[in-house]
């Protein structure tokens, strides 16, 4: 009996050779150790043996099984090692070769300007508010003191989607929504984002452009607070040596309203002024529609075009360059903070 079992193990060893594949080895395992395998079938003989010989026979079978499994496992490991070495040869890396330089990306100039303003106002305690670009007429116009028959609506040639929805013409509806949500509590926010109007695209106009509006509402807010805020923002953006000039203007959502000019020195050393934004004290009607008592609360608001800032700050002469995705233009802003 022992010789028969040993011959089974020997027959397996005789079938092992270097040309076998992993599939061949699996087939051999099934042939010898499978449910109907050569060695497995020997187990049925144990029933015919005397009781005193059964333990010894069982031990022979187990030893043979371990031997067969070991032979197959060793050969599998050899094949796997060969395959791994072949793969490593294909993936050999010459560490003496110079490395490849990855092209550095850059932030879009409008992103740079937006992040700069956000960082500045967050440092002053403001929150950054967001809102939908597809807006309801109620928030875009009505809550900004622009009733359906208000003549100032003619100033907005808008992209209407339905009778009551449009692509927002300014980021003021973000303010309206925030006021409504705040339920009469003090707020200080900025609202940057894309806006849309039916302007023909040229060097100074675009049907899509970006704004950043600011809104502060609290008790005892004065025009002096607005002026100091505008001065601080102008100096942060354009330099500490700048000053501002306020000119009376008109906006339906503020009263009084002003246009804000920022000083600069021309090539002849002469101080000149350039208009950069509009601002004013929040109109009482806007406060009321937003859920605030104008006898208790006052506020100020301002709005500035982000393309306007980028054009002045980076000396860009055509607003269309912001939206053409021309890498020759965008690559100029690598490393700009």
From Swiss-Prot:
Q: Which InterPro entries match?
A: aa-tRNA-synth_II (IPR006195), aa-tRNA-synth_II/BPL/LPL (IPR045864), Phe-tRNA-synth_IIc_asu (IPR004529), Phe-tRNA_ligase_II_N (IPR004188), Phe_tRNA_ligase_alpha1_bac (IPR022911), Phenylalanyl-tRNA_Synthase (IPR002319), tRNA-bd_arm (IPR010978)
The identity of this protein, by name, is Phenylalanine--tRNA ligase alpha subunit
Its quaternary organisation is: Tetramer of two alpha and two beta subunits.
Tell me which PROSITE patterns the record gives: AA_TRNA_LIGASE_II (PS50862)
What organism is recorded for this protein? Acholeplasma laidlawii (strain PG-8A)
* Compartments where located: Cytoplasm
- The gene behind this protein is pheS
Hey, which family's this protein in?
Belongs to the class-II aminoacyl-tRNA synthetase family. Phe-tRNA synthetase alpha subunit type 1 subfamily.
Keyword terms:
Aminoacyl-tRNA synthetase, ATP-binding, Cytoplasm, Ligase, Magnesium, Metal-binding, Nucleotide-binding, Protein biosynthesis
Organism superkingdom: Bacteria
Per the record, the GO terms for biological process are: phenylalanyl-tRNA aminoacylation
Q: Per the entry, which co-factors are needed?
A: Mg(2+)
| Chief localization | cytoplasm
Single GO MF annotation: ATP binding
